[in-house]
UniProtKB/Swiss-Prot annotation:
Transmembrane segments: none annotated. Coiled coil: none annotated. Residues 27-42, 409-432, 494-515, 803-822, 1135-1149 have a biased composition (Low complexity). It comes from Saccharomyces cerevisiae (strain ATCC 204508 / S288c). The keyword Secreted does not apply. This is Protein ECM30. Keywords: Cell wall biogenesis/degradation, Cytoplasm, Phosphoprotein. The keyword Transmembrane does not apply. InterPro entries: Hid-1/Ecm30. Seems to be involved in cell wall organization and biogenesis. Present with 1080 molecules/cell in log phase SD medium. It is found in: Cytoplasm. GO terms for biological process: cell wall organization. Residues 23-42, 405-439, 494-517, 803-842, 1100-1149 are annotated as: Disordered.
Length: 1274
């Protein structure tokens, strides 16, 4: 990486210091026409001085600008000191954490000047929006773009300081006119004017819309347009700068809405920008803007493949140019979704955006939105089908391993069960065997999470869209959502393999391996799917299955062609006997859910209640549920059937239809019996489950009590099913009678537990009064991995004070030994026998397992840094935490609630007060009565099956008459089934808001270089501070003597940025070029789209190189301007200095450009080539030439990688103290060539370790860091 012009570097350094010491501002610009306010005393504290935003005697011009008179040049109004900040591109500031720290220092040491800089940038954007587009020059547009970029960087720092301050102070954006003297705001807050300016710039000619566009024209055709004809991008490829400017505006909006990031999840602060944006903007412009965002997103999803293929074939000169365009457009669409989701996250009745989306009811609009979501939602499923049908896959033995959520090797899968049988040893040969890789499941689409958030909001607010979604896609959405729950739940994978990781994550000396850190990155980023996408799908599943229309649709049968061609082979059912045309969506779903439950039981994983709740909603239904919903006054479901006609009322047709769709199939019935058999095992019911994450906040969700409640919920669902719809439950009743031993096993298990509890009355009282059931000792995490197979009930040791004291002593010894060995507490001396008593105090000292993502930082080296969300330890996002768990669950039936349990008598036997006892006794009585009438059921052959069902159907009235008095009162009153439903509450809305921000942060965080340069250390010494210690802490002000030394040390070496005013235009332009050079190794931009397959259709990869600025050069050739492509042909040569051979040379080969790689100390003899070229340029170059080159990228038909990176990789919020969720940083040292060669053998060993999968594929130094749908950079 070459060095920029040293003069401009010195100017920017002086400006940064001048913001801290305002009285020193004149030294940075001797020709300045203004000075600090003369009303301030000379003896005032230098840090209290306030640099004026406007020039002296500019009052009339300022009044004219605020009076909507756009003919006043902005350069004649604003102080040149502030104009310097937007005279060069500051994009690189945003990706350098050290510069973020300097900005934090400026904000802390001198808040007035930092606020003035923000006010200046805001005013420049506001006044530029009011100016006529035709009057703008290239310099003006370039400064406007830089102002938008710079304000996007400063806003999070401003919010960080304001939210963390304990003192009350006014907000510059929402202050009154009296608090901001000199600004004729006319009682309109600055923040509102800024939002209005952004809205105006969003539809301004030659900035965000085409010159020929109408002011009320949308960005894209679709919603709110009479014409349905798609306007292809083929006619707009040469105007890519319009999309770049739109992206910048959307990023600025997201930054303005981000004040919530700096408040804790439980604190409710008013987000003024979001409130004003949703309620105070002009209604017509807000609707126009919202429609444009929707249309651009939907058209991109539906039409991008065809468009980009045509662009690549007919217009672009190279594949790289096409990739740059695709990357830019993808980021633009992604930002559209971010702004839409943030706008809808503000729940208020006067939200204009929500009101508009609520009123969408035209079928074309609804179809456009739904079709786009379906394409994104089915993307990985279509890729899996395509991978299976690929002819080249038949030539090898590799296949998709979908048995344990992800593709793993056969050997590792076989060893996964053995890891539960005994404590794994780090020396075990099984863990040093090199695995044989298999093709992994396709990645989800990067837009799936924000699109799912958008769909959730639309279903919640728009009744027409909810009805359309339920009628057209709900049944298929349910089966595909279960596909995601089955194969993309990485949390269950991490819990089953955490023992192995705990033994391999540290070395013998306790230091962390690079491989384990990289693996931690993989796991934590996979949690963005497990902790955001899957809860969203769970929420939608519960909402949809509570609707009678959706339940009616689930009784429809599969089409043979659809089942064959639209489901992956590994997701199809293997035990289906008979015609696929008789398989209903309900049967398929129940079987898949049963398999998931059995899988969790097999490995004793933490139960997932969504599986049981979905079975509860889907099981007790028949084909009359849609019509019966209109007969009940208590039903709030008013969705109507849109697509299919109701079935014929003829008896023959009704009978045939009833047989094929309404009855539960025998295969589905047997799946439920397997669940009852395994979940009622005595060992399973009396042991803690393996927790998803190591945390002390989830005793109930892994406790035996939770397992018993889920079993009771399943028994209640079966009881309601045959009580309300006896004929449809015949197959299930037949299976339960034929396998009557299962119900007796449930009864025996409950009785055994009850007898064990009866032996200790005190223990029994605890069980009856507490919701939790647990151990009476500290939980030993390794005990969770000693459960392999369900056998007999072990001996139950009862609680006593004597053995409790002995256990406490033994526990302390085990803890000390475990800490000395750097392992989790709980060794082989600790008995794994469970105790059926929950002692809350036993978990107080349990420390949740955490992964150390920070390594010791060496200030002499450079690091690649990635900021990501630590989902595991974040209690606001991770729904596995106790407090955040229950708001996301539906209200269970009254007999299973905590309130009902508290009403049970204290000293009753457990088998009498257990929530499932009443349903179990009813089932036992029904089975006994059926066997007394039809005793041959356990011995019949398949040919007698239908005859036996006829006999069973004849017993309907007798059975219902017998059990009716014994039914619980709430079941007895039911005339139609009432499914579980979700109810919106404040905690649920808060989680959705946090999840929205978590997705935005994940998708806008990029890799950046953390460089500790000599100039940065000099800056620290001059200000007498330590930047490394200034992360969120109070920064002490430097003394006046120290600031005086700064002024004297700068002396005559300060260089000014002189300006000349072009006659007639009034536009000030620099007299010298501000050049920035770029190495040949930077700007490598990877494609995220390829065109031939479904996978290549959506594959998105972000550039691993840091952003690069546009080279601004002034050249003359025969008095005409020469347009140069940025960072392409006219790039200043790289400076060859003595430092190019040492360890710092990796800075130049790196793709990123750092603010602190500039030469701060003034002119450098080694950098003379750049200065010489600058001094040899003609000082009399005309303004038109300069302005054209300053904004030349706006007129180039082909987009360069440097420009794309410059616009995209901004890391707006990285480096600030985000408090809404927990942020972790992963640092990886950047090795120079010399360091890499000196550690060749170490590197060789690193590559050939047993974790070579991670080294070679995930974080190899020689590979680019790629962005995947899980937020992983590799």
């Amino acid at each position: 990486m070459g060095n920029t012009d040293s003069k401009s570097s010195s100017i920017l350094l002086n400006h940064c210091i001048a913001l801290v010491r305002p009285e020193d501002a004149d030294a940075s610009s001797p020709s300045r026409t203004s000075s600090p306010s003369p009303s301030l005393s000379v003896d005032a504290d230098p840090l209290s001085l306030n640099l004026s935003i406007f020039k002296l005697d500019s009052g009339p011009d300022v009044e004219a600008l605020f009076s909507d008179k756009p003919n006043v040049p902005l350069d004649t109004v604003f102080n040149d000191f502030y104009l310097d900040f937007i005279s060069v591109d500051v994009q690189d500031f945003s990706i350098n954490s050290s510069f973020k720290k300097i900005l934090h220092i400026i904000s802390s040491l001198n808040p007035p000047n930092f606020n003035n800089l923000i006010v200046f940038l805001s005013l420049y954007i506001i006044l530029s929006a009011n100016s006529l587009p035709a009057s703008r020059t290239g310099l003006h547009s370039s400064r406007l773009i830089n102002a938008i970029k710079t304000l996007s960087i400063l806003i999070p720092i401003y919010f960080d300081r304001v939210k963390s301050s304990t003192q009350d102070h006014y907000d510059v954006f929402w202050a009154t006119q009296h608090e901001i003297e000199g600004l004729p705001l006319q009682n309109i807050p600055l923040g509102e004017r800024l939002l209005l300016a952004i809205l105006k710039l969003a539809f301004q000619d030659n900035f965000t819309t085409a010159v020929t566009a109408h002011p009320s024209e949308l960005w894209e055709i679709g919603i709110l347009t009479n014409s349905n004809k798609y306007r292809s991008l083929l006619n707009m490829h040469h105007q890519w700068h319009l999309f770049a400017n739109r992206l910048l505006l959307l990023r600025l909006l997201a930054a303005l809405f981000s004040s919530d990031l700096y408040t804790s999840g439980g604190k409710q602060d008013i987000n003024m920008f979001l409130v004003y944006w949703c309620t105070q903007m002009p209604k017509d412009k807000s609707i126009q803007f919202t429609s444009s965002l929707l249309n651009c997103t939907m058209r991109f999803i539906l039409n991008n493949n065809k468009d980009f293929q045509s662009l690549k074939a007919n217009f672009f000169s190279s594949d790289a140019t096409a990739s740059n365009w695709q990357t830019l457009y993808f980021q633009f669409v992604q930002s559209c979704l971010h702004v839409l989701n943030l706008s809808m996250s503000y729940k208020a009745q006067d939200n204009v955006i929500t009101i508009f989306l609520t009123q969408l009811q035209r079928e074309y609009d609804l179809k456009l939105i739904l079709s786009s979501f379906i394409k994104i939602f089915k993307y990985p499923i279509d890729l899996a089908i395509e991978q299976e049908s690929n002819i080249f896959n038949f030539t090898n033995n590799k296949h998709i391993d979908a048995s344990r959520r992800r593709a793993v090797s056969t050997s590792s899968h076989d060893n996964s069960s053995s890891s539960h049988a005994s404590l794994p040893s780090s020396s075990s040969a099984a863990y040093h065997t090199k695995p044989q890789t298999k093709p992994q499941l396709p990645e989800i689409h990067p837009l799936l999470i924000p699109m799912t958030i958008l769909m959730t909001n639309l279903i919640d607010c728009n009744k027409c869209f909810q009805n359309y979604f339920a009628d057209k896609f709900a049944s298929r959405f349910i089966i595909f959502s279960i596909y995601y729950l089955k194969y993309y739940d990485y949390s269950s994978l991490s819990s089953s393999s955490s023992t192995t990781r705990s033994n391999s994550s540290t070395t013998s000396n306790g230091t962390s391996n690079d491989t384990s850190n990289e693996r931690s990155i993989v796991e934590l980023n996979e949690n963005s799917v497990s902790q955001i996408l899957l809860p969203l799908l769970n929420h939608l599943l519960l909402i949809l299955t509570s609707k009678k229309l959706v339940l009616f649709k689930m009784l429809q049968t599969f089409n043979l062609n659809y089942y064959t061609n639209n489901l992956p082979n590994f997701y199809k059912l293997s035990n289906i006997n008979g015609d696929i045309n008789n398989l209903t969506f309900r049967d398929f779903t129940v079987i898949q859910l049963s398999n998931l439950i059995l899988d969790n039981i097999k490995f004793n994983l933490q139960p997932n209640p969504i599986f049981y709740e979905l079975i509860y909603n889907l099981l007790p239904i028949n084909d009359e549920i849609l019509t019966s919903s209109h007969k009940n006054d208590d039903s709030h479901d008013d969705l109507i059937l849109l697509s299919a006609k109701k079935k014929s009322a003829s008896p023959s047709a009704a009978t045939s239809s009833h047989t094929s769709s309404s009855k539960l199939s025998y295969n589905a019935a047997m799946s439920l019996l397997y669940v009852l058999s395994k979940s009622s095992n005595k060992v399973y019911l009396t042991t803690y489950a393996t927790p998803v994450f190591k945390t002390k906040d989830i005793p109930y969700m892994i406790s035996p009590g939770f397992k018993m409640d889920l079993l009771a919920l399943l028994l209640r669902s079966i009881t309601i099913f045959f009580t309300l719809y006896f004929d449809d439950a015949e197959n299930l009743l037949f299976a339960m009678v034929r396998h009557q031993s299962i119900t007796h096993q449930i009864n025996d298990s409950i009785n055994s537990i009850s007898k064990a509890l009866d032996m200790n009355p005190n223990l029994n009282s605890h069980i009856m009064t507490l919701k939790q059931m647990g151990f009476n000792r500290k939980v030993q995490w390794k005990d969770f991995y000693q459960f392999e197979e369900i056998t007999d009930l072990p001996q139950v040791n009862l609680y006593s004070s004597a053995n409790q004291q002995h256990q406490n002593q033994q526990q302390g010894q085990n803890d000390n030994r475990g800490q000395n060995q750097n392992e989790d507490p709980g060794q082989e001396n600790e008995s794994p026998t469970p105790y059926l008593l929950f002692n809350p105090a036993s978990l107080e000292n349990e420390t949740p397992g955490t992964v150390k993502h920070f390594s010791s930082t060496n200030h002499d080296k450079n690091y690649q840094v990635i900021a990501f969300i630590d989902f595991k330890s974040d209690s606001n996002l991770n729904l596995q935490h106790q407090l955040e768990y229950w708001p996301h669950r539906p209200q269970w039936p009254t007999p299973l609630t905590f309130t009902h349990k508290c009403k049970n008598p204290k000293y009753e036997n457990f088998n009498e007060v257990w929530s499932g006892t009443v349903y179990l006794q009813i089932l036992l009585r029904v089975i006994k009565q059926i066997l007394s009438k039809v005793p041959e059921i356990p011995r019949i052959k398949s040919v007698q099956y239908f005859e036996t069902l006829s006999k069973l159907s004849a017993l309907r009235s007798d059975i219902l008459t017998t059990i009716h008095p014994r039914l619980p009162l709430d079941v007895r009153r039911l005339t139609t089934f009432q499914p579980l439903s979700m109810h919106t509450n404040d905690k649920l809305l808060m989680w959705f808001h946090i999840a929205t921000w978590a997705n935005i942060f994940t998708q806008t965080s990029f890799k950046y270089e953390e460089t500790f340069s000599h100039e940065l250390r000099q800056f620290e010494s001059l200000l007498d501070i330590s930047i490394d210690e200034c992360e969120g802490n109070t920064i002490s002000k430097p003394t006046t003597d120290r600031l005086g030394y700064i002024r004297r040390s700068r002396g005559q070496s300060s260089v000014s940025l002189e300006r000349t005013i072009s006659a007639g235009s009034g536009v000030s332009t620099p007299t010298m070029a501000l050049n920035r050079t770029k190495s040949n190794g930077s700007g490598n931009l990877m494609n995220y789209f390829f065109q031939n397959t479904a996978q290549n259709h959506f594959q998105h990869l972000r550039s691993s190189s840091s952003s690069s600025s546009i080279t601004l050069e002034k050249t003359t050739s025969n008095s005409s301007s020469i347009r140069t492509r940025p960072n392409s042909h006219h790039v200043a040569p790289e400076t060859n200095n003595n430092n190019s051979t040492n360890g710092n040379s990796n800075n130049s080969s790196n793709g990123g450009f750092s603010f602190f790689k500039w030469k701060w100390g003034g002119n450098n003899s080694n950098g003379g080539s750049d200065d010489t070229k600058a001094s040899q340029r003609d000082p009399n170059v005309s303004t038109s030439i300069i302005t054209d080159n300053l904004n030349s990228y706006m007129f180039e038909e082909e987009i360069s990688p440097g420009v794309v990176n410059n616009i995209i990789e901004n890391n707006i919020w990285v480096g600030t103290d985000i408090r809404l969720f927990k942020i972790a940083n992963f640092r990886k040292e950047s090795f120079s060539f010399l360091e890499m060669t000196s550690s060749f053998f170490k590197k060789f060993k690193f590559i050939n370790s047993d974790n070579d999968n991670y080294n070679n594929n995930e974080f190899d130094d020689n590979t680019q860091l790629r962005y995947t749908s899980r937020g992983l950079y590799r």
